[in-house]
Amino acid sequence: MLVLGLETSCDETGVALYDSERGLLADALFSQIDLHRVFGGVVPELASRDHVKRMLPLIRQVLDEAGCVATEIDAIAYTAGPGLVGALLVGASCAQALAFAWDIPAIGVHHMEGHLLAPMLEENPPQFPFVALLVSGGHTQLVRVDGIGQYELLGESLDDAAGEAFDKTAKLIGLNYPGGPEIARLAERGVPGRFVFPRPMTDRPGLAFSFSGLKTFALNTWQQCRDAGDDNEQTRCDVSLAFQQAVVETLTIKCKRALKQTGLKRLVIAGGVSANKALRASLEDMLGSIKGNVYYARPQFCTDNGAMIAYAGCQRLLAGQQQDLAISVQARWPMEQLPPL
């Protein structure tokens, strides 16, 4: 089965072709970072308009790259949520229009299920069951995964997601959008131990997260340095390092708890923050200490992309899941509501 995947949940237009027998044939991505940077964050209306502009050229690009023609496509998968409604509607309407024109099925895919399954595109994919850490700009969740659609939420953030905290903290200390990569870059030049930030909610049992207080702690630290005339580039690097260390250690502690609670020794990390090198290194060390394994996608498939949507949609289509031509998207969509395969 050859599936065209379309991703438009936020500020990246992703298109890919995935074949159930040959694997990923082509993928293309257009990032809107430059468009939104001047505003310090994503502007939903601008995001939607740019998706409209980029979608068809990217579809042509992946067809050319794969050496395929439209008549060879068996189905279309598109992101149906969660995400920005206007942006989601661009991908959904394009998918359903093409599906109607080509007389093929279209299926809406859960954005975070796409992220969760992205490591399946790698040479050494994880085997079920496993614990997944979904960590992005909109989500920080620990999930037990027994199969596709078989998800048990173990814990999640009570306020800001980890990726959101990265971006907001970066903005507070004067870094450009997107803030996560900027903090990671500056943290490499930070002096360890100059600042020590708290590890929120690690002093109590449970698997819930909270990052809003950590963001406030970073702001107060930066303001104190600024009041003392010490708001220079090195201080910015030191604050970035302290913040990143706090987030990484918090996530690592909670992952270790989740693995102990479930009795599993396989961990998948997925979502944009999973590209963070410090997080990967910390989780690899932790899994090594308990003789477990950690899995993640290549960096280009950690952030939003069409390949993960094509793959996830293909699995559900192969299992016989169908959908009518109604255009339906959801800004919020708990992953536990998905039907199991």
Swiss-Prot record:
Its EC number is 2.3.1.234. Substrate binds at residues 134-138, 167, 180, 276. Gene3D superfamilies: 3.30.420.40. Keywords: Acyltransferase, Cytoplasm, Iron, Metal-binding, Transferase, tRNA processing. The keyword Metal-binding applies. InterPro entries: ATPase_NBD, Gcp-like_dom, KAE1/TsaD, TsaD. GO terms for biological process: tRNA threonylcarbamoyladenosine modification. Required for the formation of a threonylcarbamoyl group on adenosine at position 37 (t(6)A37) in tRNAs that read codons beginning with adenine. Is involved in the transfer of the threonylcarbamoyl moiety of threonylcarbamoyl-AMP (TC-AMP) to the N6 group of A37, together with TsaE and TsaB. TsaD likely plays a direct catalytic role in this reaction. This is tRNA N6-adenosine threonylcarbamoyltransferase. It comes from Pseudomonas putida (strain W619). The gene is tsaD.
